[in-house]
Amino acid sequence: LRACKKISGKIKSIGVTILTSLDNKALKEIGFNKDVRKLVYHQAKLANKAKLDAIVCSPQEVAIVKKVFKKEIITPGIRLNLKAHDQKRVLTPKQAFKNGSDWLVIGRPITKGNIKKNILSLIDHLSQ
């Protein structure tokens, strides 16, 4: 991270908290005994201490991340209809923005099926 900071005008350093495909059960299976929200909060504090430029977290944890990380927040796990598929911690774009997300990562809700129709649905969702 120190090397990144030396060239910080060119490169942005972004930290990832806990993948949106993981929930408390999955975390326990890999050896973590803390609640996912507590782990995300801890990771956000570390990101702040490391002076990262942005952080990636589930839209469900944005509010707790904002308590300790004041820079940009990027949120994957965005679903228009909340069908989670393999993701565990998802919200709609409107909910994510309401929680304080700065940037959304939207993959399958756009790329699965008719892309043009999906983009129009997304625009419609955001304009309501």
Region locations from a protein language model:
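Conserved, mostly hydrophobic/aromatic
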Residues: 47, 65, 96, 107, ...
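Generic alpha-helical propensity signal that fires on short helical segments
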Residues: 29-31, 73, 91, 96, ...
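Conserved anion-binding
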Residues: 1-54, 58-63, 70, 74, ...
